[in-house]
Amino acid sequence: MIQQKKALEIFQKRVFLESIIDETISFNKKLSWNSDNKNLTLTKTAEELVEVFKLRSDVFTEIGYQDEFPDTIEGLNFDVYDKTSAVIYYKNNKEVSATIRLIFDSENRLPSEKKESFDDMRAKYNCIGEISRNIVKTRGQGLNLEFKYLMCGIYNVFINNDIDIALSGIRKEHLKLFKKLGGVEIYKELNSYGSLETPCLIISYNPNYASNFFKKVFLEE
């Protein structure tokens, strides 16, 4: 009986994975994307998405975030929000080395609303979103290239699609870096973020107010 239950759970998770892959690919194919960087793109195949889900799992395991962001299937980190997300990834030497997603608001609402409602933002803007799953395979100190490319991807989706503002949960210590991008405001201060016992912030981000620093260093204008 226990084995049957376990087999059913595995089957249900695989069905869920297939639905996530199908709907995420469909959503990403409808988005407008304009980038000269061939290594930075939206996920549009099942193989690409599985690589992204693997990278999320590997990095979250390495940095101890699995309690807050658990795998749905062991070794694969995905959830229902992927279905309405621009899932961006960067390749280095033909290997997925970084990924980020911009979730568009839907009937599922947004993941950080488990901590704080964004209804006031919905009242102000036609379409809100949330930036999450900001994953870089090799983390160093300071501004690394992968982070730069991922934020260029977020900017790209914003400028070319119908979304007005995004919220994002970050560690308080990272605010100084994000402020440099321009268009960043503190939405809410938190003593912790779920199981992550560290001071955090929910910030709002509007790339339409990109700083000169962002345009010069990130966009290379």
Protein language model regions, located:
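Short amphipathic alpha-helix that is part of the acyltransferase structural core
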Residues: 27-76, 87-89, 96
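Acyl-donor binding region in acyl/amide transferases
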Residues: 113-207
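C-terminal helix-cap and adjacent tail motif
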Residues: 204-221
